[in-house]
Regions:
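C-terminal or internal capping secondary-structure element at the end of a domain, subdomain, or sheet
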Residues: 95-139
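Surface-exposed helix/loop patches within compact recognition domains
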Residues: 3, 10-15, 19-104
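A generic structural motif
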Residues: 6, 37, 116-118
């Protein structure tokens, strides 16, 4: 599948093997996680907790968009990972995910969001021009 975006105007392209769309059945319906990673140890992920097929979803503290990276890829200590998220201060919506097609096998759409540093919400990144077209994994 393909998974691309711009993070603060820098190109982000998910490597083969890291691009995943996983649908899971939760007690209240379906959830989906869409993600991709780069050779520079960057990761973009969007999680919808109540996924209902095609349509537009707000990204916030319930449906979450994240951008994360390892500051020093030669030191893969998970404690050093820097995470930017749409959770922000827990107020309002900080982005949108649009699913243009979903047939149970393939999912396609676009996204954009502002991610706020989990350790310092005054720092943010802008994720724009997000696009994906991915084969779905069901769990």
């Amino acid at each position: 599948g393909t998974f691309t975006a711009k993070v603060d105007r820098n190109n982000f392209s998910g490597m083969q093997g890291t691009v995943v769309a996983r649908v899971t059945n939760s007690g209240v319906g379906q959830a989906i996680a869409i993600s991709g990673g780069t050779e520079q140890s960057e990761n973009l992920q969007i999680i919808l907790t109540s996924f209902d097929g095609e349509g537009s979803y707000d990204l916030n503290f319930v449906n979450i968009g994240t951008y994360s990276f390892l500051p020093d890829p030669s030191n893969p200590d998970p404690n050093t990972v820097v995470v930017y998220s749409t959770v922000g201060t827990g107020q309002g919506n900080n982005g949108t995910l649009n699913i243009s097609s979903y047939d149970g096998n393939t999912i396609k759409g676009t996204f954009n969001f502002t991610g706020y540093n989990l350790n310092n919400t005054s720092e943010s990144v802008s994720v724009t021009d997000g696009q994906f077209n991915i084969e779905v994994t069901n769990q």
